[in-house]
Every structure is written in structure tokens, then in C-alpha cells.
């Protein structure tokens, strides 16, 4: 999101409130936005693999991980296939951009969030974290609908010119979830490793014989 913000600030005449974020993927400095999409997708895949390793007992973990990986790959694809020019014809790359980078990516992420929330609620020590992915999932659903309504030219809401603001809010919402959850997993993983090392050291000390009568 930081790269997209920088790209928007560098783009003369770009409206954060009215224009889609994808508009930054074409025209001057488009590489900043497209590289950001690819990088974010790769990071989401890495997150999914770390999530799978650090939560071994999560119910339906495999499905949730697969959906997060799908989200990451599709989001990265949005950077590989930028949207078409507004004045140009519909292209296969443009269709791939919207279908993969938005509809499939957002659908996969939403379902994954609901699965994660359900699984965390049943896992000891993580139940208090279950509400955050659930709330995030519902916010994502609501913001997707609002984004489509505000960008739909046949909708009376289109005249308000805040479709871009809705999309920025959507992307910020799920980005914060990834950051907060990633930090939580890292902190817990570090703590568990430290506790395991301490327990191993204590066990080793307990079974090591004491040498008596040594000169």
C-alpha cells in the first residue's frame, strides 16, 4: 500500500477519492504499482506457508492455506496483467487483471478469513484472536460491495466520486490484518522457540551426572 500511495502522489492529476487503484498500473511510473502488486502477492504466499507451519492444529488448515496462496498468486497476477487503457479495447490481460486480481483474489481471501476465524475459535490459546479475522472478513465483503456500487456508472452513488476511497479502505483493511496477524505469529513463534530451548536446557541439566571426587 505504501508503494501505491507513493505512485499516486507522483501521478499528476490522480484522484485517490475517485479513481481505482488499478489506474496506477498504467501510464507514468506504472512499474511502481505493478511491482508492488507482485511483491504483495509473493509476501502473501510466504505468509500462508508460515501460517501453516505455526498453527499445526488449526481445523481445515490446508484449505485456509490454499486459499491464502490463491489470493497471493492472483494478486501478483494483477501486477503481471495490468488493466487496459480506459480509451482502449478490452484485452485478455485486462480481463485477467480484474478476474484474478480482484474477484478471485478477494473471494479467496474472504473465505480464508472465515475459515481461520472458525478454526481459531476452537484452538486453545487462540480463541481470543478469532474475532479479528471474522470482523475483517465481513468488512471486506461490505467494502467490496460498496466499491462496486460507487464505481458503477448506473448507480446513483457513482456521482459521489468516492469509489477510489472505498477501494483504498478495502485494501487497507485486509493489509492491516496480514500485518497484525503476521506479527502475532512471529511473536508467538519466537516465544515458543525460546520456551522449548529453556525446557531442553533444563532437561539436559537434570540428566547430566555430577562428577564427585574429581581432583
Residue ranges and their predicted role:
Residues 1-20, 24-190:
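Hydrophobic, aromatic-enriched alpha-helical segments typical of multi-pass transmembrane helices
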Amino acid at each position: 500500500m505504501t508503494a501505491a500511495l507513493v505512485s499516486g502522489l507522483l501521478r499528476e492529476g490522480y484522484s485517490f477519492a475517485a479513481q481505482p487503484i488499478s489506474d496506477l498500473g498504467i501510464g507514468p511510473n506504472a512499474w511502481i504499482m505493478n511491482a508492488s502488486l507482485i511483491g504483495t502477492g509473493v509476501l502473501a504466499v510466504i505468509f500462508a506457508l508460515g501460517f501453516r507451519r505455526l498453527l499445526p492444529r488449526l481445523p481445515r488448515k490446508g484449505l485456509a492455506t490454499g486459499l491464502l496462496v490463491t489470493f497471493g498468486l492472483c494478486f501478483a497476477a494483477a501486477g503481471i496483467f495490468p488493466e487496459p487503457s480506459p480509451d482502449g479495447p478490452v484485452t485478455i490481460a485486462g480481463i485477467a487483471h480484474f478476474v484474478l486480481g480482484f474477484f478471485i483474489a478477494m473471494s479467496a481471501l474472504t473465505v480464508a478469513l472465515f475459515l481461520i476465524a472458525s478454526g481459531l475459535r476452537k484452538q486453545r490459546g487462540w480463541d481470543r484472536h478469532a474475532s479479528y479475522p471474522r470482523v475483517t472478513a465481513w468488512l471486506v465483503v461490505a467494502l467490496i460491495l460498496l466499491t462496486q456500487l460507487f464505481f458503477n456508472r448506473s448507480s446513483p452513488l457513482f456521482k459521489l466520486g468516492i469509489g477510489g476511497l472505498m477501494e483504498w479502505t478495502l485494501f487497507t483493511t485486509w493489509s492491516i490484518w496480514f500485518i497484525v496477524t503476521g506479527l502475532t505469529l512471529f511473536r508467538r513463534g519466537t516465544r515458543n522457540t525460546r520456551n522449548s530451548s529453556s525446557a531442553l536446557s533444563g532437561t539436559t541439566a537434570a540428566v547430566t551426572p555430577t562428577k564427585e571426587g574429581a581432583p
